[in-house]
């Protein structure tokens, strides 16, 4: 059953952690921005290695879309804007959308600075529908934009926007000041699209930055369900031993102390025995001379 999606803790059907694991390692990019009237679309360079693994599938970045106001509802209402990053699977299939709300606030972060530069660049060089501009942004990377915080997930089967959606909550929103929010509203208009999807799940772990961690699979289940389906594969990582790790291991230190104590005891035994024999021999010589 599909419903209108409202990103809120009260609407969570269950927890989805390992199957919904989102691992990323984005590289930097040069981007071109296009003003499409209802959305600002940005290109993104892809590295030689797919930057994202989601549910054991590798993805590359297709494009970034910035909407104002947001497409999703957050706790019953829309936010000032929303950044949606579209990914396409290397092996083919439905896209993966990673969505980050944008709110008006004076709080500042690297993501705030980068997004502000995008909006200012489009406002200055591509203010009208159909305009494009090259964004010469230093250090522009999704690695600094996507939050490393818990997120929600759901599947959307609506024609044209079908795929898996990962949506960060309002507490993880990118903060933009009032002037920049006003500027954004002057160069694009609202995109009247309701986000429809299946049950809303929650991943409390958040993403990480290791695209090679594919050791475990678990299906999404409602909270409290005992019929979870788990397939586990052995991780390929092997332990690495070095002198530092050995010296910091209490077991190894205990064994080392025993060995050193034994060596010291044997050494002392031979030294004392040698001294005893030496003085015994000296005593015999003295007695014989007498």
PLM feature segments, named:
Residues 1-290:
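Alpha-carbonic anhydrase
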């Amino acid at each position: 059953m599909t419903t209108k999606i409202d990103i809120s803790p009260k609407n969570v059907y269950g927890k989805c952690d390992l199957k919904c694991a989102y691992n990323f390692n984005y590289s930097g990019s040069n981007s071109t921005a296009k003003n499409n009237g209802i959305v600002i679309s940005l290109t993104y360079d892809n590295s030689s290695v797919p930057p994202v693994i989601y549910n054991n599938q590798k993805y590359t970045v297709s494009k970034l879309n910035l909407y104002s106001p947001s497409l999703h509802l957050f706790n019953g209402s829309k936010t000032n804007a929303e950044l949606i990053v579209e990914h396409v699977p290397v092996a083919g299939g439905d896209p993966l959308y990673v969505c980050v709300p944008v709110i008006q606030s004076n709080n500042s972060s690297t993501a705030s600075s980068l997004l502000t530069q995008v909006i200012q660049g489009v406002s200055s060089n591509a203010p009208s529908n159909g305009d494009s501009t090259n964004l010469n942004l230093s250090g522009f990377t999704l690695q600094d934009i996507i939050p490393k915080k818990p997120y929600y997930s759901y599947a959307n089967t609506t024609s044209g926007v079908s795929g898996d959606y990962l949506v960060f909550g309002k507490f993880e929103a990118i903060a933009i000041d009032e002037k920049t929010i006003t500027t954004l509203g002057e160069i694009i208009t609202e995109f009247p699209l309701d986000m429809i999807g299946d049950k809303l799940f929650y991943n409390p772990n958040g993403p990480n930055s290791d695209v090679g961690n594919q050791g475990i699979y678990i299906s999404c289940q409602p909270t409290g369900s005992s019929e979870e389906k788990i397939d586990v594969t052995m991780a390929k990582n092997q332990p690495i031993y070095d002198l530092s790790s050995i010296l910091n291991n209490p077991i190894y230190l205990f064994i080392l102390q025993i060995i050193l104590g034994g060596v010291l005891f044997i050494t002392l035994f031979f030294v004392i025995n040698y001294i005893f024999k030496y003085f015994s021999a000296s005593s015999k010589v003295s007695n014989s001379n007498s």
